[in-house]
Amino acid sequence: MTNNKMVCDLETGICGEAGDETFETIDLNQPQKKVTLYYVTDPICSHCWALEPVLRKFEEQYGQYFELHTVMGGLLESWDGFADVANGIGSPSDVAGHWREVGEYSRMPIDGSLWHDNPVHSSFIPSRVYKIVQQQDEQLARTFLRRAREAVFAFNENIADELVLINIVNQLGLDGEAIVKEAELTKGHELLDQDFAQARSLGVRGFPTIIMVNEENKGVKIVGSRPLEYYVKGLEQILGTTEPLQAQTPASLKKLLEKEGLLFSKEIEVLYDLEQNQVSSFIGAGISSDDYELSEILGEAYIVKK
């Protein structure tokens, strides 16, 4: 208890700080989610991986205003006839340098050497697994997508490989073999095709694309990996508010690690507004050393829940 809380004003009849108003109407209810946010993405989209720190912060601070729906967009069906002339990509090995460049710029670690010796031959395969997991549990599907991205970008695993996918799904507490097999049946193809149709109806051509739509079916489209301010501004615009949105306090690092299992330094920096050299002490102050392991990959630190 501080001293100013003990001060009682005879004029206002208040013990403590009166503030600007002695009579005002307040609303303690959380705002209803009036906005649908479509996140159109792909498991091997490098700029989607780069967006992870900002997207998490956006959800942590402003998730009370929107309902997020992840939509698979279909980046790579196969290498047969594929060419991205604008980015100089005509074969799998051409992707490696592009990925490393994105990783170095964003500081979300990307190895990329698998494109030389064990390339992902289709992103549709992990996308279909995502859709089957989503049928069982939306949150587990999001966790699957995160684990798949960790595997392919940071740890250089081919997430089109059946055994890799089975292992990722097993770690979710599900039957990996059964789900991966189901994903290749008609149902898996149909579910993914539905996402593709939705992406087309939203006018999406590149990833990541975030589209926010309000109750009047008016929308804002933001293409590419952008700073947090872009998404906040888009949300304010679609809500039609002239007042700044109320940013919620992010979950503690301990709670976040319990939920996520693995966090890279860049993600911690962005979420908690830290400089890179502050991360180590921040982790030490927030989590017991018995609860996490600190490691490094491609020059970037990360923590894993024990």
Residue positions per predicted region:
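A short acidic (Asp/Glu
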Residues: 49, 80-83, 221-224
